[in-house]
Amino acid sequence: MRIALLWVAFGALALAAFESIGSFRSEFVQTIRSEDGKIIEYRGRVYAKSPYYGLWKYEKPMEKEIYIVDKQVVIYEPALEQATVSSLQNSIDFMALLRQSKRNSEGIYEATVFEQKYQILADEKGEPQKVFFIDKLHNEVQIIFKNAEINPVLEKEMFLFMPSGEIDLIRQ
């Protein structure tokens, strides 16, 4: 659940120079370093579309999918055959956050979402490459995007959780 909350927080993130970004697709590597120095690495794919759609598909070390549509989050864990549905107080809008972030004097974009500060690095074309933040549990979180595509065609239906077969559905 902690990982999901990190992604939910991240889903709200953004870059100001990225006003022309309406959708985003990328592979990612997420590294979490705890206060005691332990490191956990996750790999997967992320999809985002304006105005408020997000999908994080974790592939390693375990499969997990996080679907975000406005204020609703569904965390699906195939190995457990269960999905958790939660409602948020605030909408998570990845694209709006990209547009809201501001470039500092060092060329790093910064955004604050729900009192959480994020730093975003962009390449020479102004495309998001890396995100860094320290979460509420004092973990250092770094997300590196690889093979990113800006403004790919993404159908809204891909962001809707449609379980196949029987699963346990938990509502929070």
From Swiss-Prot:
InterPro entries: LolA/LolB/LppX (IPR029046), OM_lipoprot_carrier_LolA-like (IPR004564), OM_lipoprot_carrier_LolA_Pbac (IPR018323). One of its GO terms (cellular component) is periplasmic space. Pfam families: LolA (PF03548). Residues 1-16 form the signal peptide. It is found in: Periplasm. GO terms for biological process: lipoprotein transport. Keywords: Chaperone, Periplasm, Protein transport, Signal, Transport. Participates in the translocation of lipoproteins from the inner membrane to the outer membrane. Only forms a complex with a lipoprotein if the residue after the N-terminal Cys is not an aspartate (The Asp acts as a targeting signal to indicate that the lipoprotein should stay in the inner membrane). HAMAP family: LolA. Belongs to the LolA family. Monomer. This is Outer-membrane lipoprotein carrier protein. It comes from Wolinella succinogenes (strain ATCC 29543 / DSM 1740 / CCUG 13145 / JCM 31913 / LMG 7466 / NCTC 11488 / FDC 602W). The lineage of its organism: Bacteria, Pseudomonadati, Campylobacterota, Epsilonproteobacteria, Campylobacterales.
